[in-house]
Amino acid sequence: MPQNGQIRYHCRMTMSDRSSTGGFDPSGIDEEAWTELERQLEATIPVYDKVNKIMTLGFDKGMRKHVRSHAKEGMKVLEVGCGPGSFAVGIEGVELTCLDPSAEMLKVCKKRLDLVREERGENPAKYVEAIAEEIPLPDNTFDRVFCLFSFRDFKDKKKGLSEIFRVLKPGGQLVICDAGKANWLHGIFGRIYMGTFVQLVARIVTKDPNHPWKWLARTYTHYGTHSYYKKLMREVGYTGVKARLLFPGMSSRFKAMKPEQ
């Protein structure tokens, strides 16, 4: 039952054979690996924004601003994988729903976001504890769905994309911003960056040699390329699918539309 404006919903996904890659591949993540991933993500909460700012060389703010520009006043907006609310606090003038599988992330997000929206004279956001693959919300509800550095954490990316397609209104748009991997060559440079600079930054900030980013680097290693996910989106039914790197090349932005009926 909903509590404090928050809906909780979870399901168990079917495991596939990814034993040689520790439970990861471009299409998704096995249950055991995903459960550990969520635990590691929750461990990032105290330093989430600080580490992300340093590891993106300060471009995280601009990336979020770029994605927010796709939301117009009065729209119904869903953020899938809202985390601690770093993106959501900057969206103004919309009817906002924040979804995340982590109760701890939603707790932090709600505390930050409710205060900001109250100060702006806006209605409170809605909060849903659920996975992207099973969104407990009606069909054809949202004008925009945003995924900010959460898409690579989906258990089943095609199913997640299908659920987002379902809850989008006809003519609605999905915008994803996540790790940059334009092609396999670009991915090699990304792995080096994630395996050296990001690890060093995380260790300094957290003062912990076993910091969560050491484990989270796996999500990038097994993340797919632009062409892989563009194909997946078209298979689901999206049109106008586009992907491009965002300066300075550490992140990618995908855009895709649900066709008008």
Feature annotation, model-predicted:
Residues 144-156:
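A short SAM/SAH-binding and catalytic strip from SAM-dependent methyltransferases
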